[in-house]
Amino acid sequence: MLSLIGSNENDIILDFFSGSATTAQSIMELNAENTDSYRKWILVQIEEEIQDHPEAIKKGYKTICDIGKERIRRAGKKIKEESPLTTADLDTGFRVFRLDEGNYEDVKRSPKEFKQDQLDLFLNNIKTDRNDLDLLFGCMLDWGVQLSLPMTQEVVDGKTIYTVNDGDLVACFAEKVSEDVVKAMAEKMPLRVIFRDSCFAQDADKINIYETFKQKLDWSDQEVVKNIRVI
């Protein structure tokens, strides 16, 4: 199907009504048949509940999205099992994102709206129900970093460090990070760095972190401001 509609080897195919994910399966099969094909896919589907398929409900599928995800998993597994030699490097993985509002509270207020005993409520502008991955992927979107890039995690001094694509972006969102954590992040020679404001016990700690990256990566003052983001 896809080979007949004019798509090229490196195209991204977007299916805005993906249903049971037929498009994803077709692209993976095409990539498996043609080793020069690196087509990617993006599927969009409303999380519509299943109502008229009792057998699917019995198997634990609650929405059309559930069926689509399972189809992608099974199709990828089958493709690799049928052609293990030629599909060893074939990427059949995928990530699932749910559309939501932004990660930040609206803390914009006029001076008249502020009360002295309420100022502490505005110190943290990140919504309380957001986790590290919410913040990480939100920053990736803001920075234009591909959401499909490989990602790793490691724990240093009890704090989790996230590394995207071997250093395209390195992030830590834990509170009061130590010098060892900062050095471990700098050792990755990242292009971009993200911290949460609560990573720092005091403002002086931010300055020390900036200096660490300047020395390790030979960044100028302008590059530090550009490449390090505190949210």
Q: Which residues are covered by each model-predicted region?
A:
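A phosphate-binding catalytic loop at a beta-strand-loop-alpha-helix junction
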Residues: 11-30, 140
